Amino acid sequence: MEITISNKIYIKDFSNDLLNWAEKNLTIVNPKWQTLKRIGKEETIIRCHIPEYIKIYSIKGKTLTLPFGCLYGIWKFIKSEKIDLKLNDSDYEISNKNIPTRIELYDYQKEAINNMVLSKGGVLVSPCGSGKTVCGIEIIHSIGKRFLWLTHTGDLLRQTRSRMKSLYPELDIGLITEGEIHIGKDGCIAAVQTLANVDIDEFKDYFEVIVVDECAHVSGAPTLVKMFQKILDSIPARYKYGLTATPTRSDTMIKAMYAYIGLSKNGEFEPTYKVNKDNVKTMVALHEKIDIPFDIDFSILNSDGTFDYYNLINYISNNSKRNDIILDNICKCQQEGRKQVVLCQLVSHCETMHKKLLERGIKSELVIGKTKNKERERVLNSPEEWDVIVSTYKLLKEGVDVKALDTLHLCTPQKDKATVVQCVGRIERLCENKKQPIVYDYVDIKIPYCERKYIERKRNIDKRY
């Protein structure tokens, strides 16, 4: 048996034990098939040829190919047999350039960075507000090799580059984003959407360290999954790291994140290191339930009596009396001098709430997907100019760092655990003279679905991650 470790792991003349390991661990139930099956859409499954399983390994002739991150998973097979192991690069050792660190790290950050560097890869799980970006930057600094930092939003890209340049101004950091491809001497920060659509072969051997910010997206929405996996499969970097606060999914696709980035040192599909939330210096938000007492309109139900989630969101978003309850509470918080963020599921709901707040004399800012980058940066960097930001869950959950925020209004019943936890984390940042952070959760108590989702949110907020 011969194993070559490059952009992927290539195993020639593989054993039955290795094949069994791949079949067991790298065959994942297709979440799309699972959803359609659950709601009785067998005809769609057949018509669209949707497979029940997704395999993240392949066999061609006598060669078994695995994602690079599976190395620790198959290490026991490498040790147990006489194997010809080949690395297609000559340098797999850490070579710090002796650039002194300029970051005053907390003890929990030092421990996390040390563990990740010694592991030479894997997933770091660290709570919102714990300084994941700082940890990623210091991992790169400790290894001292050319890096590629992958992110999926323009906000995260700009924030990361600004943070790196402020800490290490002597580094030549390139950018790969829409309308700009500049390969820096020391590394690059790249938007995954851009990098996935250029010829990666031109510089695939240039980078030796990859850091995937918010790496849960490696196993998230299908479009992003394909982009991340194409890049990770193409670049033979010896050090691949992932950063996330919420390594959870309701299905088994999370295994793909570990397979492509790195299993733990004991070969399990779990984080390489997990920061204890009790060690993190943040302010813990209170969680207050606001009862919404209105009766349900049964027209939002499906014919079988079940809820249609999107009809439900439309219904409660357009309920003016319900909105007035939320607006009254926002005004009360404004009189207390709070810095608030109001989250809605629908852009139209955001626009309605923003307009109503302005009519009440509240200094409100609307930040949605179509908000231009320059305007968004102005809002996020000037909290003294506003009382309230109105935005969507999707936009706030990643890439927003306004330490002054202390109040969160959950206007609609968000059901995704990761989204809720990340949004709560946005108001728990430490800031001088900050008020006690508080989450207002508006719950339609006469709609059983909404009450159940509130209980789930409360449990997830209490546990954090």
Regions found by a protein language model. Give the residues of each.
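Conserved SF2 helicase motif VI
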Residues: 126, 247, 415-435
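A short beta-strand element within the Helicase C-terminal
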Residues: 400-413, 422, 438-441
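Post-DEXD/H (motif II) to motif III coupling segment of the RecA-like Helicase ATP-binding lobe
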Residues: 217-284, 461
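Conserved helix/coil segment N-terminal to the catalytic DExD/H
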Residues: 178-209, 220-221, 225-229, 395
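Conserved segment of the helicase C-terminal RecA-like domain
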Residues: 426-455
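Conserved helicase ATPase core of P-loop NTP-dependent helicases/translocases
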Residues: 158, 172-183, 351-352, 362-397
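Walker A/P-loop
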Residues: 119-143
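Conserved interdomain hinge at the start of the Helicase C-terminal
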Residues: 304-345, 352-355
